[in-house]
Regions:
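Catalytic glycan-binding domains that act on GlcNAc-containing polysaccharides
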Residues: 20-152
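N-terminal Sec-pathway targeting helices
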Residues: 1-9
């Protein structure tokens, strides 16, 4: 077996092992305090059929649902919104108030997800579009596009 493949398999199984130790989104380990916001804004920006747990899982991945989280690059709040991104989102959505208030942080994160989601072709499967959306949220839309071109 080539070295790259065996290294990839080791990484895959290590990731699987770690993931099996992380509590599920619905687990009581995670606070339910923000669930109404995840429900409300996922429906507002994605429609009633969307499973709001996508966005709670994103909040867990971004900050562990810590409302006062700040990253080394100054991303803020539960959804780890960059200040410049929040400023741009406020121009398009005047209801957004303060990035550090959980309600508006979650609203901004899901609103941004909806913008990214719409950038991916509609002929893609829903699951692929959501995965690309989540990847774009973290790495940037153009980064994901470049990675796709390299992988072809």
């Amino acid at each position: 077996m080539p070295r790259v493949v065996s290294t990839g398999l080791v990484f895959f199984f290590a990731t699987l092992l770690i993931a099996s130790e992380i509590p599920k989104v619905s687990d009581r380990h995670w606070t339910r305090k923000y669930d109404p916001y995840f429900r409300k804004y996922s429906k507002r920006f994605f429609g009633p059929a969307i499973d709001w747990h996508w966005f709670k899982a994103q909040g867990i991945a971004e900050s562990g649902l810590r409302e006062n989280a700040k990253s080394w690059v100054n991303a803020k709040g539960i959804m780890q919104i960059m200040p410049n991104t929040f400023t741009e989102l406020k121009k398009k959505n005047a209801q957004l108030k303060d990035v550090m208030i959980p309600r508006w942080n979650i609203c901004a994160g899901i609103y941004y997800d909806s913008i990214l989601f719409k950038k991916w072709e509609e002929d893609r499967k829903f699951l692929d579009r959501m995965r690309f959306t989540m990847g774009s949220y973290n790495a940037g839309f153009r980064t994901i596009l470049r990675a796709q071109k390299v992988s072809r």
